[in-house]
Amino acid sequence: MNSIDLPSLAQALADSTPTIRHNWTREEAAAIYHAPFADLIFRAQTIHRQSFDANAVQCNQLLNVKTGGCAEDCGYCSQSSHHDTALPASKLMDPAKVIEGAKAARDAGATRYCMGAAWRSPKDRDMAPVIEMVKGVKALGMEACMTLGMLTDDQAKQLADAGLDYYNHNIDTSEEFYSSVVKTRSFGDRLETLEKVQDAGIKVCCGGILGLGEKPTDRVEMLRTLANLPQHPESVPINMLIPIEGTPIAATATPVDPFEFVRTIALARIMMPKSDVRLAAGRTAMSDEMQALCFLAGANSIFIGDTLLTTPNPGDSKDRALFARLGITPRDDLGVHAHGNA
């Protein structure tokens, strides 16, 4: 009996160029999300193979360079000064310490170093050390990503001039549900910063969180908002809520059905076919089987390391074991996709 080259057969199913669209309707997106599960996953995996190596996952590491004391009231966040989470506020880290952490992350297999500061927006005096961090990470041959809150046009330009590759600024959920999660800023504020970042020539990392009390419609609308931007975010992180004691949402949060989470990953892959879709926070609550389904649905990026800002992460040894079981290898191309750029 002749053997069948399954990888080649699977790739043969993905022999066309993915269609990039910015005009998705509510009805179209909802129909995809609610499609029979096998059909949804098949479509997402087929589209995934048109632009990416299906067995390679991009690895990032995230560091909190300034913890706590944030003026925003995000209902899920332990770093908000509005909530009693017993998390002390810290000063901005010394850039040398940040760069030291980036070296360790690179040695562990990370190709992108993400740095987060718990601010509503950075003050002008904060920009010099932040820029030093960006330049230091870039000097290591890594991609640099920052999340600092809302930016002015000038701050975005300074970051671009320093060589920042990505700016993370999540929209969290749908516009309709947003005020149930955050009241100190508007959904429009988020979109305004995304526009400034893109205008400055920085790539955008933008996604959301599942488990905030939203409905499936909100998940669909969140992704439709991103897919209908003039330029798709180059990275789309999908987080599962980790309820943190002392935050308002923790008191009412209910776990997300695993299949609903996987459906969200698949919809992101289908509507934004050339973006990295990141399986982000919440992996400690996911079984290996659930993570495998997420990769099958088109997730191709994770955070490595033991922590994500103030929440736990599986750690390198568990991720290596999972990758070995699934035949996945870390993507070591410093952000250049196997079949083209995002």
UniProtKB/Swiss-Prot annotation:
Domain of life, per lineage: Bacteria
Example GO biological process: biotin biosynthetic process
Disulfide links within the chain: none
Keywords: 2Fe-2S, 4Fe-4S, Biotin biosynthesis, Iron, Iron-sulfur, Metal-binding, S-adenosyl-L-methionine, Transferase
Pathway terms, separated by semicolons: Cofactor biosynthesis; biotin biosynthesis; biotin from 7,8-diaminononanoate: step 2/2
Catalyzed reactions per annotation: (4R,5S)-dethiobiotin + (sulfur carrier)-SH + 2 reduced [2Fe-2S]-[ferredoxin] + 2 S-adenosyl-L-methionine = (sulfur carrier)-H + biotin + 2 5'-deoxyadenosine + 2 L-methionine + 2 oxidized [2Fe-2S]-[ferredoxin]
Span of domain Radical SAM core: 55-274
Cofactor: [4Fe-4S] cluster; [2Fe-2S] cluster
EC number(s) reported in the record: 2.8.1.6
InterPro entries hit by this protein: Aldolase_TIM, BATS_dom, Biotin_synth/BioAB, Biotin_synthase, Elp3/MiaA/NifB-like_rSAM, rSAM
Positions with a binding annotation for [4Fe-4S] cluster: C70, C74, C77
Pfam families, alphabetized: BATS, Radical_SAM
Residues noted as binding [2Fe-2S] cluster in the record, renumbered to the chain: C114, C145, C205, R278
UniProt key word Lipid metabolism: no
PANTHER family: BIOTIN SYNTHASE, BIOTIN SYNTHASE, MITOCHONDRIAL
Family matches, as HAMAP family: BioB
Functional summary from the UniProt entry: Catalyzes the conversion of dethiobiotin (DTB) to biotin by the insertion of a sulfur atom into dethiobiotin via a radical-based mechanism.
Family: Belongs to the radical SAM superfamily. Biotin synthase family.
Subunit structure, interactors included: Homodimer.
The protein's name in its UniProt record: Biotin synthase
Organism: Rhodopseudomonas palustris (strain BisB5)
